[in-house]
Amino acid sequence: FPTVSLPGAAVWHVPWTEKDDGLDWQAYFHQRNRWVAALLHSPYPRGASFPKTSLASDVRALLSLQYYSADLRRQGLKDVLLGPGHLHPSMHTRAAEARAKAKEYTDARLMTEAADFPAVHRKKPAPVGTKPDSRAQFISKAIAGITKQFLPEGEHREDRVEDVLSSTDARWWRLANLNSALVSNAEGSGAWRYQRDAKHYRRALAESIALHAELIRR
């Protein structure tokens, strides 16, 4: 497209730090399109480290209790496995289907009224996860976080959460230590309730591993 210079004018754009596009319906397209691009253009056999980083992203989402975006990512993998023939028929339906799926997940239903926010209740101070600053710490925290996801969640109450986190603080090494949390969105206009579900985690992790293995096999 042609461009023009307009002295004295500027264009404002929302900063990337204030976007949640990796957590909403767009997560499906991020995952599917990355794989399609890698399959078409990667010069490396089997995409080199790409399948590993893709699986790691799924694990990170699950450790962060972001079950909605993790499930959309797996749907993206399933559609990649269907082959290119699905792209055009699904072009006009996948976005609406992804949005509709948000109703099934508390971590996708944005609460904007303070009266709807659950109270913070702790029997003891919530564990404060810190960013791993070495490979050894990263591995140790990842193993601890993954192990916790297999344990029973304990008491579950809709009117309580263990902690409140901003979007910038909602990282896997903090969320993996919690059973529940209230997490604000990037722009600060609302919050989601994150709730750990060990059964869902086990099923989702197994499915993600199987899908990645099948993509590598093919």
Residue ranges of predicted features:
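Terminal low-complexity segments of carbohydrate-biosynthetic enzymes
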Residues: R32-R218
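Active-site donor/metal-binding and catalytic loop motifs
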Residues: P7-L23
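Secondary-structure capping and boundary motifs in well-ordered enzyme cores
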Residues: L23-Q26, P51
